[in-house]
Regions:
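A short, solvent-exposed, low-complexity linear motif enriched for acidic/polar residues
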Residues: 19-229
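C-terminal motif of bacterial Sec signal peptides marking the signal peptidase cleavage site
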Residues: 15-17
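Positively charged n-region of N-terminal signal peptides that target proteins for export
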Residues: 1-5
Length: 229
């Protein structure tokens, strides 16, 4: 809920939030592939295989500074810069940043139609599985081509993870003071590490493809890294 976690709409607000006497920190979420920043729609490579991620949506939950949860859930749309920048309240130094990857079990049973369109859990974000009556955690779509050139005979990629058993958490022990700028990076190459781009490009967390969803979910803690500036 964005009453305590507000989107950054301008560089001016970012700079103002980081001055002396600040009672907040800024959070920036970035994408990387093998440590190199990229944008949705850009062609990437794993060996000779070309990859293009055309949609990257996911949830982060129970975002906490120290022992204080500052936001129950946020929705990230990698093509919407406002969903990649936030301001979090912080009045004193803490030594830990923690968060969940996906939707926690309490929020995962919520009815998406009960929320306004600007709420992270709203049906407007198209992240709810009506057949499973729960949310997708990560929704990543795209294309791959083993020839190294996209455009002809591409193989579709759809990694949709969800279900409570696939929720993962991470704690980062690091000193954070009011006025700091936090950079949380999601490395997609780490996310699909050990996953075949030939035979494991599709999962909807159902019985026949659940093992792929487990692999991807187990990779999540290593795929996210935090830097404090």
């Amino acid at each position: 809920m964005r009453s305590t976690l507000l989107s950054i709409f301008s560089v001016a607000l970012l700079l103002a939030s980081c001055g002396e006497g600040s009672q907040q920190v800024t959070l920036e979420i970035n994408l990387e592939h093998n440590g190199v920043p990229f944008e949705v729609g850009e062609t990437l490579y794993k060996g000779d295989t070309a990859i293009k991620f055309e949609l990257i949506h996911f949830y982060l939950s129970q975002i906490a500074l120290g022992d204080q949860v500052v936001e129950p859930v946020v929705f990230i749309n990698a093509q919407d810069s406002t969903s990649m920048h936030y301001v979090l309240p912080l009045t004193k130094k803490v030594d830990q940043f923690s968060f969940g990857m996906g939707v926690d079990s309490i929020n995962n049973i919520q009815d998406p139609t009960s929320f306004g369109s600007d709420h992270p859990l709203s049906s407007a974000n198209a992240m709810y599985w009506s057949w499973a009556t729960m949310y997708r955690f990560f929704k990543i779509d795209g294309r791959v081509n083993a020839t190294g050139a996209l455009g002809t005979n591409d193989q579709l990629l759809a990694w949709h993870t969800g279900k409570n058993a696939l929720y993962r958490t991470k704690e980062v022990n690091v000193s954070i003071k009011p006025g700091a700028h936090l950079v949380l990076t999601f490395d997609l190459a780490e996310f699909y590490s050990g996953v075949s781009l030939d035979t494991e490009t599709m999962t909807h967390s159902m019985v026949d493809d659940y093992a792929i969803a487990v692999k991807l979910s187990d990779n999540l803690p290593a795929a996210f890294s935090l830097r404090v500036q």
